[in-house]
Structures are given as C-alpha cells and as structure tokens.
C-alpha cells in the first residue's frame, strides 16, 4: 500500500445476487468516505459466493457487476485496491491453516448466520459452515485495522479477533487484531415489504428491495407499494413506526437531509406524500448511478481487478510466509 502511516480497512461483497439500495446506503457510501482517510482494500469475495450453488456463467458476470457497482458508487481504484478473492491463493491457504491451528468446532457451532441460512438442510455445504474462517483469513492477510460490516457480520469479525489472538498466543505474534466498524445510521436498511426484515438480495420477493439495476419506473412502483404503519403521523420511531422510520432513514441518506428536518417538513402530511417524494429521490439517484454503472466496460473492470491483485498479492504472501515460519512448515 502507498501510505504505511494510514490504517488499513478491509471489506467485501459477495457476487451472489443483485446489489440493492441497502448495500449502497449501508456499506458503499461509508467505504467511499473511508478511502480518503485509510488504505482501503475492497474485495469481490467469490469464494464466499460458492458456499451455495451458483450458475458458473452468471457468477462470472456478477463478479464484474460488483466491481461496476463499486466504481459507480465512487470507489476510486487510484485510492483503493479492488480485487477478486480467488485471484490470491493465500486466502484459502491461510483459511486451512486457521482451521487447523486456531479454529475450534465450538467456535463455528456458535455462528448464528449459519444456523439461519442452513436451517435443518443436510445438503448444506461444508464451505457454508466454515465461511467465517475464510472470512478471518481474508481480513488477517492484510494487517487489517478496521472492518466495516453490517450487524449480521459482527459475530464473524469477533471470531476473526479470537482466531488471531489464539494463533498469536500459541505460535508467536503474527496477526494484527482488527476492530469492527458499524455505521450508526443506515447500517440496516429494512425491507420495503416487511420492515422487520433487512433489505436483502436473497429475499423471496423482489418487493423487498430496490436493486441498483432496477429501472427507475420499477423502483418508483416499489416505493409507492411499500408497507406503512398504522396511524398517519410521519415520525421517526423504529419501535412503533418501523416502516415509516425506514422510509425516513432512506430518504435522509439519499437526499442528505436530517430526519428532524424531514419530520418537520411532513408535519400534517400523509404517507402518500412521503412515498411520492422518496420515489422521486430514488428515481433521480438511480438515473445518475446507472449512467456511471454502464460506463465501465468488461476489459476495464478486469484490468482494475488484475491491478488490485498485483498490488496487494505481495502483502498476502508475506503474511502467509510469516505464518508458515511460525508453524514450522515454511
């Protein structure tokens, strides 16, 4: 990395489905802000994506689409490293070493996200169970100081800290202990059809989310059909008015207007007016975002991925070499 005095930030997105407004507001805008203060490494975590079955041709295209999304959101490859996880073999090597030298079955049995995703299915892959250890390897390879994640990933970063501390204790100091960074507002943009559930690319209904590739017309319809709460007052109260609160947060983040200002502006007005104005704001955003998104051609995206891997590959290899020396297998 260019500036060794800056702290290092690492995060990533799976190319496993459509990226949506929740990803943009909850993660990508935060990353864009961070790249001016930190050495930022943003990964397309394709090995994580294949923990559930993917159609190969679709996966290949989605990898490029994730990078386009990064770029359209404002992540600048001159400031941040963007790379594909599978391009650097040290990720899977370190994951295996951590499996053997630091991780315990008891650790993984506590992971709530696996329980949520797997349910009682016996056909679930071992990779999905072991996902948090690969995530730990992703983070630890680059001497990461901070990991911006959603609330559903906090437990995995805590496991990363545990594995790093355990390895350092048993074999000698190698890993930096990373900290979790959670955005205060917008960390969880909720579903338009059910404000009790997070906006998610794996939702059973497309009414749950606004995809960043939705046509503006489709997005407007989704906003207008979004569920609301009983009563008519437009007030931010996540417990009593979760649906309206979610719309207010979305509006606030997109338009750069405080929630207090929005509440004052909609005093005496109805939900219909709020949704109409929010729909217009979303429409303007999507038109601008998609213009940038479609401007990045495949060859340019592949070059950015290669340049990123070339830049940080040596860091990963140096960490892995140090780990192997400590283990006596180098």
Language-model features: locations:
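N-terminal Rossmann-like or analogous alpha/beta NTP/dinucleotide-binding catalytic cores
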Residues: 2-137, 286, 291
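Short, histidine-centered active-site or binding-site loop motifs used for metal coordination
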Residues: 13-15, 46-48, 145-146, 203, ...
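Conserved nucleotide- and phosphate/pyrophosphate-binding catalytic cores
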Residues: 23, 155, 161-330
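Short, polar/flexible loop-turn hinges at active-site or ligand-entry regions and domain interfaces
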Residues: 55-56, 146-150, 234
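Short catalytic-loop micro-motif centered on adjacent basic/acidic residues
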Residues: 81-84, 148, 231
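Short helix-capping/linker segments at secondary-structure and domain boundaries
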Residues: 102-109, 141-148, 252-262
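Internal, conserved structured core segments that host functional sites
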Residues: 113-167, 171, 191
């Amino acid at each position: 990395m260019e500036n060794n005095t800056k702290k290092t930030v690492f995060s990533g997105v799976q190319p496993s489905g459509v990226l949506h407004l929740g990803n943009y507001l909850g993660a990508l805008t935060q990353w864009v802000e961070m790249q001016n203060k930190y050495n930022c490494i943003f990964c397309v975590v394709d090995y994580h994506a294949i923990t559930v079955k993917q159609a190969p041709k679709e996966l290949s295209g989605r990898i490029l689409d994730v990078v386009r999304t990064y770029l359209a959101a404002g992540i600048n490859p001159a400031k941040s490293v963007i790379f594909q996880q599978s391009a650097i073999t040290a990720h899977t090597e370190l994951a295996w070493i951590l499996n053997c030298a630091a991780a315990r079955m008891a650790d993984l049995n506590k992971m709530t996200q696996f329980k949520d995703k797997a349910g009682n299915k016996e056909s679930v892959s071992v990779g999905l169970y072991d996902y948090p250890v690969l995530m730990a390897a992703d983070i630890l390879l680059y001497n990461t100081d901070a990991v911006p994640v959603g609330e559903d990933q906090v437990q995995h970063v805590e496991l990363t800290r545990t594995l790093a501390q355990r390895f350092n204790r048993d074999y000698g100091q190698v890993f930096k202990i990373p900290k979790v960074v959670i955005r205060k507002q917008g960390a969880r943009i909720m579903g338009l059809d059910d404000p009790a559930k997070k906006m998610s690319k794996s939702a059973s209904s497309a009414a749950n989310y606004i995809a960043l590739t939705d046509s503006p017309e489709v997005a407007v319809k989704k906003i207008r059909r979004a569920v609301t709460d009983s009563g008519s007052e437009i007030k931010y109260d996540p417990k009593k008015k979760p649906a309206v609160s979610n719309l207010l947060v979305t509006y606030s983040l997109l338009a750069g207007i405080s929630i207090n200002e929005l509440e004052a502006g909609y005093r005496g007005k109805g939900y219909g007016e709020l949704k109409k104005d929010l729909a217009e704001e979303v429409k303007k955003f999507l038109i601008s975002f998609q213009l940038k998104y479609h401007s990045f051609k495949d060859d340019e995206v592949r070059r950015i991925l290669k340049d990123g891997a070339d830049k940080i590959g040596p860091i990963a290899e140096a960490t892995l070499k140090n780990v192997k020396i400590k283990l006596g297998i180098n």
